[in-house]
Regions:
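Hydrophobic alpha-helical connector segments
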Residues: 80, 91-120, 173-176
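Amphipathic, non-transmembrane alpha-helical scaffold segments
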Residues: 28, 78, 82, 86, ...
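C-terminal peripheral helix-coil segments that are non-catalytic and often amphipathic
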Residues: 1-19, 152-156, 160, 192-222
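Short amphipathic alpha-helical segment with a characteristic S/N-K-E followed by hydrophobic residues
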Residues: 35, 73-79, 88
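Short secondary-structure transition hinges
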Residues: 115-162
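Basic, helix-initiating cap at the start of DNA-binding domains
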Residues: 1-46, 50-62, 76
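Short hydrophobic/aromatic patch on the recognition helix
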Residues: 61-71
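Hydrophobic alpha-helical bundle segments that form small-molecule/ligand-binding pockets
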Residues: 144-172, 176-179, 183, 187
Length: 222
């Protein structure tokens, strides 16, 4: 076989291999996304511990081996799903913060999405997350970031005249965070509706932080 013919043959073979590799890569990428979506939906509906890896594989019509090739453990699957959720949520919050005219409009937008989110999620999902160390560490990091974001949000509210400027917001955040943890640890969401919890925890707290202008705006929301 002539030398150049061999070169052309090898080039064609290489292109075919590269195309096959790309197709496999695209397939795995799409499958990874489908696994995350299916698993997180099941976790939110039934609770994390109630959903087995076998259940996820069966729902997608794939083998357990294929599932474990992409996610070695259930914790890795959950961890990536949680990270994806937080990335999307942060992107949404950034857009809302930029698009809303004032902090009160931001509160309304976030309130609506959070209430809808809690309605669609089995409370056991939140209770189960602490059982997974990687997820718990990530959530702790996110809580620290939320702390920083909240302080900036309050500064904006002070500037706009909706929040009081004589409040220790660092302390207020610590107290609010402690109340939120109390709700979760004692599973108050099993006794009260999400609307009741938000009304009595979030809005009562916010009312104490508002100026007269802020209280009037808050009353329109509630």
């Amino acid at each position: 076989m002539p030398f150049f013919t061999i070169i052309l043959y090898l080039c064609r073979q290489n292109r075919m291999i590269m195309q096959e590799s790309k197709e496999i890569s695209d397939y795995k990428k799409n499958l990874r996304g489908s696994i995350l979506e299916t698993a997180m939906h099941a976790f939110a509906k039934k609770g994390i511990r109630a959903v087995k890896m076998d259940d996820v594989a069966a729902a997608l019509g794939i083998s357990k081996r294929t599932l474990y090739e992409i996610f070695e453990t259930k914790e890795l699957l959950l961890s990536e799903g949680i990270r994806k959720y937080y990335a999307e949520r942060q992107d949404y919050y950034r857009r809302v913060t930029q698009q809303c005219k004032n902090v009160m409009e931001v509160l309304v937008a976030i309130y609506r999405i959070k209430v809808d989110e809690f309605r669609k999620t089995n409370p056991q999902f939140y209770a189960d997350m602490d059982k997974y160390p990687k997820v718990a560490r990530f959530l702790n990091q996110q809580n620290q970031q939320t702390h920083k974001d909240m302080l900036k949000f309050m500064e904006r509210g002070i500037y706009e005249g909706y929040f009081r400027d004589d409040v220790n917001y660092e302390l207020a955040w610590l107290l609010f965070d402690a109340l939120g943890k109390y709700v979760m640890v004692n599973q108050l969401y099993r006794q009260y509706t999400i609307e009741e919890i938000f009304q009595n925890l979030v809005f009562v707290t916010m009312r104490g932080l508002c100026t007269e202008k802020g209280v009037k705006a808050l009353d329109k929301i509630v």
